[in-house]
């Protein structure tokens, strides 16, 4: 059984203008991560779980919807999933 650890910012991010459907998907995502860990998240194609690059190297991302992402890291030796951020992904380039 994996543990889920949320950064203190996550509560503030979720309390904002996050749609209820995204909150439900995030709770389901946490249930899957808690029970089966990163392998379970990768097995469900709807999450489109993937490694991140550049400044987020070492982190992973799962889709909660077309726009929303949960960004997290895995600490395998402690069976821990650290949620860093739940955010509306911005596709605009600077």
PLM regions: where:
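Basic, Lys/Arg-enriched alpha-helical interface segments
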Residues: 1-66, 74-94
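Hydrophobic/aromatic beta-strand elements that line small-molecule binding cavities or substrate pockets
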Residues: 70
